[in-house]
C-alpha cells in the first residue's frame, strides 16, 4: 500500500477514535396542541437566586420549590440563593412544536460573551441545542460558536416529553435528563427508583449504552387530576413524593407517599385575594373530610379541589363508602432550602402504595431529611477507542518523523 494512502487511513482512524460521539436524544413526535405537565432535570451552572433560576425557565419560583419538596412557605423564597452544582427538577409545560414535544415558553436575554453553544450547554445544561436556538430565532446558517449580541432576547426551546402521561398503564410525569460523565442506565434507574428495562423501553434503546450529553426521559409515578377542560389547571399532574402550587398560589396539591391520590388543600401563602375554598352547602373547607362508621363500612365525606376558573376555586363535596376508615392524611416530607450542592430531591415510593411515612404541611419543619441516593461509580467509557486513537497517532507520528 502506498505510504500516502496508509497515512490517510491512519489519520482517519485516529480522528474516528478520538472524535466525540454525537449525543443521542429521545424525541417524542406529536400532533396535539395540548401541553402536558413535565419536569426537567437541571443542575445550576452558578450560584443563582431562586428568582433568577425561575426566570431562566419562565417558571414560578414557588412551583420549583414545590416540585422538589422544598419548603415553599419560607420567608422571601425568591431571594434565596441556591448553590452552583445543585440538581433540581424544574416544572414546565411541554407543548407540541413543529411535530416534536418541546418547551416553548422560555426566553433568555444574552449576556456579554454568550454564544449559541454556551447558552445551550452551559446555561441550559444541554437541554437544548445550538441548532434549535438558531432555528427558533431565524438565525440561519449560524455556527455553534457564533457570538450573540448582549441584550438579545432568544427563544430557547427545550427537550421535554409527555407520552400520554402514562407508563406501563400507570399515571406518570416525564422528567428529561441529560446524562453526565460516568452516568449509566442502571445508575439513573436506581436514582429515580425505576428499572433499567423500563428506561430502555421508554427511550427505545437497543443497548444500555449512555454517554455524556445523551438526553433521555424518565417516567415518574404521579397523581393525576380530572378537572374540566375549561379550567386553567386542566391536566394537572404531580410526581409522587412532591407538591404543586396552583390556583394563583392559593392551592397546594401533593402526591403520596402512601398512595397515588391527588390531595389538595389551601396553600400556606393563601390570603384574602384567594376566592372561597368552602364546599357549597357545607361548612367543610378544601381538604377537610369527615368519617362515619356504618353497618356497611366507613362513609367518607370530603371537600375536594375541582380546578381554577377565572379567579374562582372550584370545590366538590363527595361522599364515598369505604371498607375501612382512613387514618390522618400523610404529606410528603418537606426539606429546608438547600445551601449545599450535596442534595437529592425527595424521591417518592414506587407506584405500589406503601405504608405512610411521617410528613408535614408546607411551612412546618420536616420530620426527616431523605437520605441521598448514589449510583455505582463512574464507568470507564470508550477505553478501546482511546487506545486505538493513541496507537494510530503514534504510527502517524513515526511516519511523519
From Swiss-Prot:
Tissue note: Expressed in roots and leaves.
Bridged cysteine pairs (disulfide): 30-96, 36-162, 94-160, 96-162, 223-255, 250-279
Keywords carried by this UniProt record: Cell membrane, Disulfide bond, Glycoprotein, GPI-anchor, Immunity, Innate immunity, Lipoprotein, Membrane, Plant defense, Receptor, Repeat, Signal
Propeptide residue intervals: 374-401
Stretches assigned to the LysM domain: 106-156, 175-218
Lipid attachment residues per UniProt (GPI-anchor amidated serine): 373
Gene3D superfamilies: LysM domain
A GO CC term assigned to this protein in UniProt: plasma membrane
Membrane topology reported for the UniProt record: Lipid-anchor; GPI-anchor
Signal peptide: 1-23
Record bears the keyword Transcription regulation: no
Induction details: Induced by infection with the bacterial pathogen Xanthomonas oryzae pv. oryzae.
Name of one Pfam family that matches: LysM
One GO BP annotation of this record: innate immune response
Quaternary data: Interacts with LYP6. Interacts with CEBIP. Interacts with CERK1.
Function: Functions in innate immunity. Functions as a pattern recognition receptor (PRR), sensing bacterial peptidoglycan (PGN) and fungal chitin at the cell surface. Involved in resistance against the bacterial pathogen Xanthomonas oryzae pv. oryzae (Xoo) and the fungal pathogen Magnaporthe oryzae. Binds PGN and fungal chitin in vitro. Involved in microbe-associated molecular patterns (MAMPs) perception and participates in the activation of defense genes against the bacterial pathogen Xanthomonas oryzae pv. oryzicola (Xoc) or the fungal pathogen Magnaporthe oryzae.
Miscellaneous comment text of the record: Plants silencing LYP4 exhibit significant compromised defense responses and enhanced susceptibility toward the bacterial pathogen Xanthomonas oryzae and the fungal pathogen Magnaporthe oryzae.
Name of the protein in its database record: LysM domain-containing GPI-anchored protein LYP4
Organism, as annotated: Oryza sativa subsp. japonica (Rice)
Lineage of the organism: Eukaryota, Viridiplantae, Streptophyta, Embryophyta, Tracheophyta
Amino acid at each position: 500500500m502506498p505510504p500516502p494512502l496508509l497515512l490517510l487511513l491512519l489519520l482517519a482512524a485516529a480522528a474516528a477514535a478520538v472524535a466525540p460521539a454525537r449525543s443521542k436524544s429521545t424525541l417524542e413526535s406529536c400532533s396535539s396542541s395540548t401541553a402536558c405537565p413535565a419536569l426537567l432535570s437541571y443542575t445550576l451552572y452558578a450560584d443563582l437566586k431562586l428568582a433568577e433560576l425561575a426566570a431562566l425557565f419562565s417558571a414560578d419560583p414557588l412551583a420549583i420549590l414545590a416540585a422538589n419538596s422544598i419548603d415553599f412557605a419560607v420567608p422571601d423564597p425568591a431571594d434565596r440563593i441556591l448553590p452552583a452544582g445543585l440538581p433540581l427538577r424544574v416544572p414546565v409545560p411541554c407543548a407540541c412544536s413543529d411535530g416534536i414535544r418541546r418547551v416553548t415558553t422560555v426566553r433568555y436575554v444574552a449576556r456579554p460573551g454568550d454564544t449559541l453553544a454556551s447558552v445551550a450547554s452551559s446555561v441550559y445544561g444541554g437541554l437544548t441545542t445550538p441548532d434549535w436556538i438558531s432555528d427558533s430565532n431565524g438565525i440561519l446558517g449560524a455556527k455553534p460558536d457564533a457570538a450573540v449580541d448582549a441584550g438579545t432576547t432568544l427563544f430557547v426551546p427545550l427537550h421535554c416529553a409527555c407520552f400520554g402521561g402514562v407508563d406501563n398503564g400507570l399515571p406518570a410525569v416525564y422528567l428529561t435528563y441529560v446524562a453526565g460523565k460516568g452516568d449509566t442506565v442502571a445508575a439513573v434507574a436506581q436514582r429515580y427508583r425505576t428499572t433499567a428495562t423500563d428506561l430502555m423501553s421508554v427511550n427505545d434503546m437497543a443497548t444500555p449504552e449512555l454517554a455524556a450529553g445523551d438526553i433521555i426521559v424518565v417516567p415518574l409515578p404521579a397523581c393525576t387530576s380530572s378537572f374540566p377542560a375549561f379550567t386553567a389547571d386542566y391536566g394537572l399532574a404531580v410526581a409522587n413524593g412532591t407538591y404543586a402550587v396552583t390556583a394563583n398560589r392559593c392551592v397546594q396539591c401533593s402526591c403520596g407517599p402512601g398512595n397515588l391520590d391527588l390531595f389538595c388543600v389551601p396553600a400556606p401563602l393563601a390570603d384574602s385575594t384567594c376566592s372561597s375554598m368552602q364546599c357549597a352547602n357545607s361548612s367543610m373547607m378544601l381538604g377537610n373530610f369527615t368519617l362515619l362508621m356504618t353497618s356497611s363500612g366507613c362513609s367518607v365525606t370530603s371537600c375536594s379541589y375541582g380546578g381554577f376558573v377565572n379567579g374562582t376555586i372550584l370545590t366538590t363535596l363527595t361522599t364515598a363508602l369505604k371498607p375501612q376508615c382512613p387514618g390522618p392524611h400523610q404529606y410528603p416530607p418537606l426539606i429546608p432550602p438547600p445551601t449545599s450542592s450535596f442534595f437529592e430531591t425527595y424521591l417518592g415510593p414506587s407506584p405500589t402504595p406503601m405504608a405512610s411515612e411521617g410528613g408535614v404541611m408546607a411551612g412546618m419543619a420536616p420530620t426527616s431529611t431523605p437520605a441521598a441516593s448514589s449510583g455505582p461509580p463512574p464507568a470507564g467509557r470508550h477505553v478501546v477507542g482511546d487506545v486505538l486513537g493513541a496507537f494510530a497517532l503514534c504510527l502517524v507520528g513515526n511516519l511523519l518523523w
